[in-house]
Amino acid sequence: LSSGATATTARAFSAADLRAFAGLSGTHAGAHVPEPLIAGLVSYLLGVQLPGRGTNYLKQELEFHAAAPLDTEITATVEVTRLRPEKCLVDLWARCALPDGTELCAGRALVKAPAGMFPASGA
């Protein structure tokens, strides 16, 4: 775990995915991918890749700029911007975009990572 480290994942959501989400959330399936599904890609990265297993999600702030069409790959990226090993905290920048570069959302996240993930202080 180091400042500047990144992780990326990509996924396209189908009409069937939206119907399943609508059934779980009590909403209706629309013509675009719902923002919570897009934000879920960031959540996945934080819990599975960076920092990864054992991470405790504290805060996420995403500002959405565009709608995501169905069956179009969405790429989510997170980057470590600050490490606070004394508190086991990690600040990250997050972004989701379409293949043409259109930014769907961007923002930040704060997580608590297991102490063993931080580099030794050298003290």
Put a short name on every predicted segment:
Residues 1-55, 59, 118-123:
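Hot-dog-fold acyl-thioester-processing enzymes
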Residues 3, 70-123:
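HotDog/MaoC-like acyl-thioester-processing domains
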